[in-house]
Swiss-Prot record:
Residues 25-55, 87-92 form a propeptide. This is FMRFamide-like neuropeptides 16. Its main location: secreted. Belongs to the FARP (FMRFamide related peptide) family. Residues 1-24 form the signal peptide. It comes from the Eukaryota. The keyword rRNA processing does not apply. It comes from Caenorhabditis elegans. One of its GO terms (cellular component) is extracellular region. The keyword Repeat applies. It is found in: Secreted. Keywords: Amidation, Cleavage on pair of basic residues, Neuropeptide, Repeat, Secreted, Signal.
Length: 92
């Protein structure tokens, strides 16, 4: 079998690609830098990468009727609560 330089390099590149893909499928990513450890995999508590839960934010809107009231909306279904506003007239 006579191989030209281009054919031979193509065959070698193909086998190297197959070898690399099969090695990546066999070795998990955790072992790329040594043996994975449960505690060392977790970030430090003061780290920027520590898990932070998003704060529960409420959508605030104002409705203008007889008097302006500010409402706060929580949750997926949009439960509405009166946050600020007067339910009774001013005492004089």
């Amino acid at each position: 079998m006579n191989f030209s330089g281009f054919e031979f390099s193509s065959i070698v590149a193909f086998f190297l690609l197959i070898l690399q893909l099969s090695t990546a499928a066999v070795l998990p990513a955790d072992y790329a830098y040594g043996v994975a450890d449960e505690m060392s995999a977790l970030p430090d508590s003061g780290s920027l990468f520590a898990e932070q839960r998003p704060s529960k934010r409420a959508q605030t809107f104002v409705r203008f009727g007889k008097r302006a009231q500010t409402f706060v909306r929580f949750g997926k279904r949009g439960q509405t609560f009166v946050r600020f506003g007067r339910s009774a007239p001013f005492e004089q």
